[in-house]
UniProtKB/Swiss-Prot annotation:
Function: The third module or late pathway involves the ergosterol synthesis itself through consecutive reactions that mainly occur in the endoplasmic reticulum (ER) membrane. Firstly, the squalene synthase erg9 catalyzes the condensation of 2 farnesyl pyrophosphate moieties to form squalene, which is the precursor of all steroids.
Protein name, entry field: C-8 sterol isomerase erg2
GO CC annotation terms, alphabetical: endoplasmic reticulum; endoplasmic reticulum membrane
Lineage: Eukaryota, Fungi, Dikarya, Ascomycota, Pezizomycotina
EC number: 5.-.-.-
Keywords (A to Z) from UniProt: Endoplasmic reticulum, Glycoprotein, Isomerase, Lipid biosynthesis, Lipid metabolism, Membrane, Steroid biosynthesis, Steroid metabolism, Sterol biosynthesis, Sterol metabolism, Transmembrane, Transmembrane helix
Organism of origin: Aspergillus fumigatus (strain ATCC MYA-4609 / CBS 101355 / FGSC A1100 / Af293) (Neosartorya fumigata)
């Protein structure tokens, strides 16, 4: 009669199979716990974002309007006016007063930016171009406020037949999760303020480098200044 005992090789195979299965279940369990903790932490912090903000959209809009009234079409003077007042009103040395202009390619649009502030929950920049640009706004994890200082910005959403028009002194509020086509006609500069979760927005800012421009020196400059400001602000307890 044939033997009913299993061979050592088949026993070993069953043990290895059982071990792999148990290991996979443990990994899945750890992953599920991690995702649950992350989701709970995100929900907790997201509901309390207001306590981390140091800028106010209404004040920035008022400041932009006063800069325009004081300096007309002199954008250089408007930038100085804005930074000087913010330096007086925002405590804690959270501003970058070294005016470092960097090209920015994102969503097909190209311009230049000066990063005044960057942290985990906010950024404030001067963004614009002297020759015009057009592109995709991106779909972001933060509210974005474009305070137009010079020139005109227009925007379009599907289903409408007329553009949204934003002349100097107005604010274009791109709400969190919304998306538009936008254009800065000819020379146009804005004080741009974002509040919400800033790090996920960096993927949008980096994508054009890898898919189009291959301008890695500019990518490095953006990373260096943004990272420096975010880390510096974290060390100063600005989340």
């Amino acid at each position: 009669m044939p033997s009913k005992s299993s061979s050592p090789q088949s026993n070993s195979t069953r043990k290895n199979s059982c071990g792999c299965c148990c290991f996979s279940v443990r990994k899945f369990g750890f992953l599920a716990v991690f995702v649950a903790i992350f989701a709970a932490l995100y929900s907790y912090l997201d509901a309390r974002l207001e306590q981390f903000y140091i800028f106010n959209p209404e004040h920035l809009h008022d400041l932009s309007q006063r800069a325009i009234q004081a300096h007309g079409n002199d954008t250089r003077a408007m930038v100085d006016f804005i930074v000087a007042e913010l330096d007086q009103k925002i405590p804690g040395n959270h501003l970058n007063k070294n005016e470092e202009w960097i090209f920015n390619n994102a969503g097909g649009a190209m311009g230049a930016m000066y990063i005044i502030h960057a942290s985990i929950t906010e950024y404030l920049i001067i963004f614009g171009t002297a020759i015009g640009t057009e592109g995709h706004t991106g779909r972001h994890t933060a509210d974005d406020y474009f305070n137009i200082l010079q020139g005109t910005q227009v925007a379009f959403v599907p289903g409408t037949f007329e553009p949204e028009v934003y002349p100097p002194g107005t604010v274009h509020h791109l709400r969190r999760g919304e998306v538009k086509q936008y254009k800065m006609e000819q020379s146009c500069f804005a004080l741009e303020y974002a509040r919400g979760w800033i790090p996920p927005m960096l993927f949008f800012g980096y994508a054009d480098t890898f898919t189009s421009t291959l301008d890695f020196p500019t990518l490095w400059a953006t990373t260096r200044v943004t990272g420096r400001e975010m880390i510096t602000n974290l060390l100063r307890r600005k989340f």
